[in-house]
Amino acid sequence: MSAKTKVKTKKSRNSKVPASLVWFEIPADDIKRARKFYSSLFGWKIKAFPNMEDYWHIDSGGAHASPDRAIMKKMCPEHPVTNYILVDSVTRASAKVEKLGGKVHKAKTAVPNLGYFAICQDTENNVFALWEKIESAK
């Protein structure tokens, strides 16, 4: 790797590097069936996410397993798996998505006590999400 392309990052054992895949959601028509499928296939422990209807957290190996994941109620027949990518600022990254020809379908939204996200679409019509971890989010 040349000096120009080498990227140095500082992170603790428990932190994620910006641009890392940090979360994904699996949409399901039948959550019970999806829970059974994935827990049987991979041994994932799947539990209801606090204060969220039809949203289930998947534990695939403890607190430091990465990326984190969830099963949720499918919102439409074409609902894709959504990958959440860590960014320093959802606001700045959303603006950059649009500048580069992508679209922001759901603007910056708070997940109380966890952070902010935005749902975007790239130039090839792939859906993805931006994630900014801020525990003071309201």
Language model features: what each stretch is:
Residues 2-35, 64, 81-83, 132-138:
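N-terminal beta-strand motif that seeds the catalytic metal site of vicinal oxygen chelate
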Residues 4, 44-80, 123, 127-133:
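Conserved short beta-strand elements that form part of the metal-binding/catalytic scaffold
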Residues 21-29, 73-99, 116-121:
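Vicinal oxygen chelate
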Residues 34-38, 97, 125:
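Conserved active-site tyrosine of GNAT-family acetyltransferases
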Residues 40-46, 101-103:
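Conserved acetyl-CoA-binding loop of GNAT-fold acetyltransferases
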Residues 49-54, 110-113, 137-138:
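Short glycine/proline-centered loop/turn elements that form peptide/ligand docking sites
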